[in-house]
């Protein structure tokens, strides 16, 4: 994670974990904090929540907030599980974390107070959660899509879309795109009123990377197999006549 002049790196592992901030120009260690000796894989992220910038990371049976400038702990909450992969997401001053091994839990925390708002026994182990317009959308590892009210945790709907997922869902306009490990992309509406499938498309034979969007183009990295040969392929999808937005 890049924050101002810092590159913030997490290395949680059984040999002894740590969280560190490096000077982006020199690589010098600005601060370093020890973390539990547990393997977990979530990336840290900085949000302006609770009236200040907070560096938040999930895993090691906890969700912890640090001051990104100094590494000092702001708050810590017991929750999720040992191993988390998805990055924390936010809605206003609420932050959300989920983990799936060996236990499973999704938790909502008020970042201003460090207090738990709600929690459940559901999980998205590898894919990250997606927040849009006050609702959380989940496409879990086993291919079940869920919509929760972000403030209360109330389930709005649940739908099996099939497949196994490692890539995170992304929002494009008012649609959500999720691609499973076999390369099947499913598009459905980001609508708390109910699940509505918009389209499906097969792209390659394997997919583990999260799609990205830039300049009205959708980019997907997948793999194609031919016998024992495996070749990764990058797809760029968009209308040929669509206006390309130039980066400033």
Each predicted region: which residue ranges?
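Noncatalytic, solvent-exposed loop/strand surfaces
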Residues: 1-248
